[in-house]
Curated annotation (Swiss-Prot):
GO CC annotation terms, alphabetical: cytoplasm
NCBIfam families for this protein: nadA, PRK09375.1-2
InterPro entries: NadA, NadA_sf, Quinolinate_synth_type2
Entry keyword annotation includes Isomerase: no
UniProt-annotated binding residues for iminosuccinate: 23, 40, 112-114, 129, 199-201, 216
SUPFAM superfamilies assigned to the protein according to its UniProt record, in alphabetical order: NadA-like (SSF142754)
Residues annotated to bind [4Fe-4S] cluster: 86, 173, 260
Cofactor annotation: [4Fe-4S] cluster
Subcellular localization, as worded in the UniProt entry: Cytoplasm
Protein name: Quinolinate synthase
Family that this chain belongs to: Belongs to the quinolinate synthase family. Type 2 subfamily.
Protein's GO biological process: 'de novo' NAD biosynthetic process from L-aspartate
Keywords tagged on the record: 4Fe-4S, Cytoplasm, Iron, Iron-sulfur, Metal-binding, Pyridine nucleotide biosynthesis, Transferase
Length: 304
């Protein structure tokens, strides 16, 4: 049963001819009013297919809303709280990428979508945690500059013969850095029958203990397709909420404290105000958007 605030949002969404996109880490009440929920890759693909809407309300962090604009420069892209920034996306600047290219002129540059538009514009192609290995394998170059998440870079290196150089050396997601091998061992001892699903932004010693290393979208598919009845979820805590909307199987957060405070800045009240006032508008300068779009679209072609 939707509450009054949720019903108000659905009414406003119809009046404004808007669509609401939400990342899997959003709260239950926001996931319940979203037109589409997904991981970074799924949201990129969905954003590239939007037709017949004037406004896109993006319940995610800054780089996600920027990507929606890059793919839809003719639409008004709104983010309910403009303070919703991804710390990892701010760990790699466009200048950092240019300097790395000068140092390794024969390398391809693969950037995680978790980067700001200015950095994306310097990339040859983008990737997400769902398609990173496939993207790297699609390249002719044997040397790949990969950033900004060093743990995802490690994961890719484990699954390719190419040489992966992380840029910067210590880029990371603060939420996934919370998980330790000790947390995993304790959870497996407490829930021995549960499958352990781990995100590739986790540290290598955590990944090595996983039953499956998956993006959040991959985690949802695994739960739906597996014969197992319980799962330990090694990513942001509200991924268990996302799964619960699709499945009655038992999901246990690896850490209850694994909360992305940046994602949680969005609330129903802010979504409502975003629609009423058409705020906060997200744009990207034309030349940066053009160059970044090329890298985004190349990724989407590899993924489809």
């Amino acid at each position: 049963m939707l509450n009054q605030l949720q019903r108000d949002i659905l009414r406003l969404k119809k009046e404004k001819n808007a669509i609401i996109l939400a990342h899997n880490y959003q709260s239950r009440e926001i996931q319940e009013i979203a037109d589409f929920k997904g991981d970074s890759l799924e949201l990129c693909i969905e954003a590239s297919r939007i037709e017949g809407k004037d406004i896109v309300v993006f319940c995610g962090v800054d780089f996600m809303a920027e990507t929606a604009y890059i793919l839809n420069p003719d639409k008004k892209i709104l983010i309910p709280d403009r303070g919703a920034e991804c710390p990892m996306a701010h760990m790699l600047s466009a200048e950092d990428v240019r300097m790395a290219r000068k140092r390794y002129p024969d390398a391809a540059v693969v950037l995680y979508v978790n980067t700001l538009a200015e950095a994306k514009a310097e990339a040859d192609i983008l990737c997400t945690s769902a398609n990173a290995v496939r993207v790297v394998e699609s390249l002719d170059e044997d040397l790949v500059l990969f950033g900004p998440d060093r743990n995802l870079a490690w994961y890719v290196q484990e699954h390719t013969d190419k040489t992966i150089i992380p840029i910067p050396e210590e880029g990371h997601c603060y939420v996934h850095k919370m998980f330790t091998a000790g947390d995993v061992m304790a959870a497996k001892e407490k829930y021995p029958e549960a499958e352990l699903l781990i995100h590739p932004e986790c540290d290598p010693e955590v990944q090595e203990l996983a039953d499956h290393i998956l993006s959040t979208g991959g985690m949802l598919r695994r739960v739906l397709e597996s014969d197992a009845e319980s799962f330990i979820i090694g990513t942001e805590v509200d991924m268990t909420t996302r799964i619960s909307l699709e499945s009655d199987k038992k999901t246990i957060p690896l850490l209850e404290e694994a909360i992305c405070e940046n994602m949680k800045l969005h609330t129903l009240e802010k979504v409502k105000n975003s629609l009423i006032n058409e705020e906060f508008v997200v744009t990207v300068p034309d030349e940066i958007a053009r160059r970044a779009r090329r890298a985004v679209e190349r990724m989407i072609r590899v993924s489809e």
